[in-house]
């Protein structure tokens, strides 16, 4: 279970403070792959970043005993002057045991299919290459929950198939919390849904299709 307790997140703007959400309370139940649904600006991606420890709330708490990934495929944290291999090694030292480090690096190298670019500076990469490296890095470590934000759109048809296959493998032992504009992806990968509604609160649905229907009514 992941419990979101009185979570508030805001940003300062020229016209005043903008609240992404205020005193948000949600329970992500244990044992499910969960679709996170909401209109643009509802705070779906922001919430994933907070749950994954990439962003900080103004106030409130994330309560869980589970090991949670950063948002899968997040490429913004790479150091551009370092090579792909060097970036991967840096992260692997934080998340892998010493005797597993080389195995994790080899996995990312094979999965990302970057060839010689794996040993070239990240600043020479295209956005697609960064995304493939970031996705492979996210998949190299074991988490109880993987946070997925539109990552199913990454790469060509072959790479998308590889992503789909590894999602299926992950779901055998772990779970997903997924944000996607693709109804097909949400229905395929998720069992239940949480809808961030117009009132700024999360409503739980046992059926993803019903959550999508209510979301469409509010458009």
From Swiss-Prot:
Kindly list the places in or outside the cell where this protein is found, as annotated in its UniProt entry: Cell inner membrane
**Transferase among the record's keywords?**
no
Q: Topology relative to the membrane, per the entry?
A: Peripheral membrane protein
Q: Which residues form the ABC transporter domain?
A: 2-218
PROSITE patterns according to UniProt: ABC_TRANSPORTER_1 (PS00211), ABC_TRANSPORTER_2 (PS50893)
Q: Which SMART domains match?
A: AAA (SM00382)
Q: What is this protein called?
A: Polysialic acid transport ATP-binding protein KpsT
Q: Could you tell me the gene encoding this protein?
A: kpsT
């Amino acid at each position: 279970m992941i419990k979101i307790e009185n979570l508030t997140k805001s940003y300062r703007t020229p016209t005043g403070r903008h609240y992404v959400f205020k005193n948000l309370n949600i329970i992500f139940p244990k044992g499910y792959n969960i679709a996170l649904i909401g209109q643009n600006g509802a705070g779906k991606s922001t919430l994933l970043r907070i749950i994954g420890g990439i962003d900080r709330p103004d106030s409130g708490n994330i309560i869980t005993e589970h090991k949670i990934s950063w948002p899968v495929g997040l490429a913004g944290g790479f150091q551009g002057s370092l090579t792909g291999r060097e970036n991967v090694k840096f992260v692997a030292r934080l998340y892998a045991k010493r005797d597993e480090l080389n195995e994790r690096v080899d996995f990312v190298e094979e999965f990302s299919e970057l060839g010689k670019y794996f040993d070239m500076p990240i600043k020479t990469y295209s956005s697609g290459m960064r995304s493939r490296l970031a996705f492979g890095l996210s998949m190299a470590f074991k988490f109880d929950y993987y946070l997925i934000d539109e990552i199913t759109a990454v790469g060509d048809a072959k790479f998308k198939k590889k992503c789909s296959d590894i999602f299926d493998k992950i779901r055998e032992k772990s779970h997903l919390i997924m944000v996607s504009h693709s109804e097909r992806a949400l229905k395929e990968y998720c069992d239940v849904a949480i809808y961030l509604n117009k009132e700024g609160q999360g409503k739980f649905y046992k059926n993803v299709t019903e959550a999508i229907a209510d979301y469409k009514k509010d458009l």
